[in-house]
Amino acid sequence: MNTKRITYLAATLALATAAASCEHEEIYEPLEFSVQLAPTNTYRTGDPVVFNFSGNADFITVWTGDTGHEYKHRNRTKVDITDIESCELEIEISQQYGTLNNLVLFAGNKFAGLNGSDAATDRPVVEAIAANDCADWTKLEFTPNNANKFETYTYDITRFADRFSWGMHLFYPDPKTTMRTYRINPKITVKFKGHDTQVYNYPDMEFVPFSLASQHADNPYIHNVSGNGNLKFQGRPGANNTANIVFQGFSAGAFPEIDQWAFMQPVALNTISPDTGLNIKGVTDDLPSYSYTYTEPGTYTVTFIVAGGNYQGQSAPAPYEVTFTVIDPIE
């Protein structure tokens, strides 16, 4: 690398009755760096691999080459749908009171989402879903009961991963009966080939409620208000903290109608976080070596991004790679 010099005019200094100007040279120093594998490395899973450094690098970032830490994937935010090994929606549900089932759960990938603040736009969408009895969705089966205990149901949603959404419909078929209380905790788990498992907990999901009940005609997005007969979401004012999502039931005849819907806004489940590196050296650190332990056999390419930057000058970041194979211990 050639040394570059950039000259600029320094700020004018006031000295009593005279002024003077000067020039200052900022030096771009050539980077000298090398990385070598320690001769004592065994390259067995569970044993540390040691990297020895020499040179004048002031900053070092390492990408260890294992899952989630490959330099070549530092800008990757999406993988092919075929790289999804499994995709599951887990719903933990508690049901209390009443003798009739008042809840339908459904999932799919044909839903474009709701506006969330424009009822004139959203109402026809929800009405169409209601009119065709969720024909474009797959209903999620669960066992109705009033046991007031949480039960967990797991659903394979891999086929919906490109634009996944799920939702619920609460209804009141017989005003002479008690409306059941529901408490729901959802979670989505996506396993990939060659990437860390991605988990979507409730805070990662955005829900939009919409009521088609006549008493909510002027406020169809109603939720998180006090009292029975309302849908409540955790993390918003007025939440019921017994679960992430709660519909508070009521005694017979307390409400003339319940036609409450809620939808998770669609999300592409093949979206991932970019791979990351680890900063292991700064200007003031003395780092003659670095070690890392691999727990899985395989061929790894480790990338070190190194740069210089101190009072003597600086250098542009440069990559250095080392490739090796790790095997399981021989019995």
Feature locations, PLM:
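C-terminal motif of bacterial Sec signal peptides marking the signal peptidase cleavage site
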Residues: 18-21
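Acidic/polar, low-complexity intrinsically disordered N-terminal segments immediately downstream
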Residues: 23-102, 107-115, 297, 313, ...
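Residue-level recognition of secondary-structure-to-loop junctions
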Residues: 43, 284, 288-296, 300
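Extracellular carbohydrate recognition and processing domains
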Residues: 124-159
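Short beta-strand-plus-loop segments that form exposed binding edges in beta-rich domains
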Residues: 168-176
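Short, solvent-exposed loop/turn segments at the edges of extracellular beta-sandwich modules
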Residues: 174-175, 307-314
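Exposed low-complexity, polar/acidic, P/S/T/G-rich flexible segments that act as propeptides
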Residues: 175-220
